[in-house]
From Swiss-Prot:
Gene name in the database record: rimM
Domain of life assignment: Bacteria
Listed transmembrane segments: none
Quaternary structure, from the entry: Binds ribosomal protein uS19.
Naturally occurring in which organism (per UniProt): Francisella philomiragia subsp. philomiragia (strain ATCC 25017 / CCUG 19701 / FSC 153 / O#319-036)
Protein name, per record: Ribosome maturation factor RimM
One BP annotation, GO: ribosomal small subunit biogenesis
Length: 169
C-alpha cells in the first residue's frame, strides 16, 4: 500500500560551500513547517519519497536553509535542488468541518447547480481576502472564489465540488 504525502517545502539553490540549500516553505508559516515530525524527500528525477535522516534546518532571520546529512559540498548539493520535502498525509492535523487542505482540492471536478462542468481544480490562488480555485476544462480556465457564498457542496472522497457560479461571472 503506498502512502500519500503532502508537500510542505521545496529545496532551492545551494547557499554555502558546505552543501547548505535554501528551503522554501509551502506551509502557511515557518512554525507550521517546523512542527511536522519526520520529513521525506522526493528528488526531481524520482517520484518515490525517501525518509530524510539527520537533516538540520537552520533559520536565519526570516529565511530557512537545510543541511542534509550526506551532503558536504556544493556539487553534491546541486543534485537536491528543486527536490520536494513532504510528510505523510496522516501526520497533518485533522481539519474541522467546512475546512480542507488545498492538496485535497486539487483534482476535484467542479460543476455548478445546473450541472455545467468547469473541469478540474488545477491550482489555488491566495489573494489575501480569500482563496480562488483555478479550474481548467479543455483549453478554458475559470477562476471561482473559494468562499461559502459560492460553495454549495463538497465531497472530497468523490473529488466533487458543486458551486453556485455561472460561466459568464
Amino acid at each position: 500500500m503506498s502512502q500519500d504525502f503532502v508537500e510542505i517545502a521545496k529545496i532551492g539553490a545551494t547557499y554555502k560551500l558546505d552543501g547548505e540549500l535554501n528551503l522554501y516553505p509551502l506551509a502557511s508559516s515557518i512554525e507550521t513547517l517546523l512542527s511536522y515530525g519526520d520529513w521525506y524527500i522526493q528528488l526531481p528525477a524520482n517520484s518515490a519519497w525517501q525518509p530524510l535522516k539527520d537533516e538540520s534546518v537552520l533559520r536565519r532571520a526570516d529565511k530557512l536553509y537545510i543541511k542534509l546529512a550526506s551532503v558536504n559540498d556544493v556539487e553534491t548539493a546541486k543534485k537536491y535542488v528543486n527536490s520536494l520535502i513532504g510528510v505523510p498525509k496522516e501526520a497533518l492535523p485533522k481539519v474541522g468541518n467546512d475546512e480542507a487542505y488545498f492538496t485535497d482540492l486539487i483534482g476535484c471536478t467542479i460543476v455548478n447547480t445546473a450541472n455545467d462542468s468547469f473541469g478540474k481544480v488545477i491550482g489555488i490562488i491566495e489573494t489575501g481576502a480569500n482563496e480562488v480555485l483555478v479550474c481548467k476544462k479543455d483549453s478554458d480556465e475559470y477562476l471561482i472564489p473559494y468562499v461559502k457564498q459560492y460553495i454549495v457542496s463538497e465531497d472530497l472522497d468523490l473529488k466533487k465540488i458543486v458551486v453556485d457560479w455561472e460561466y459568464d461571472y
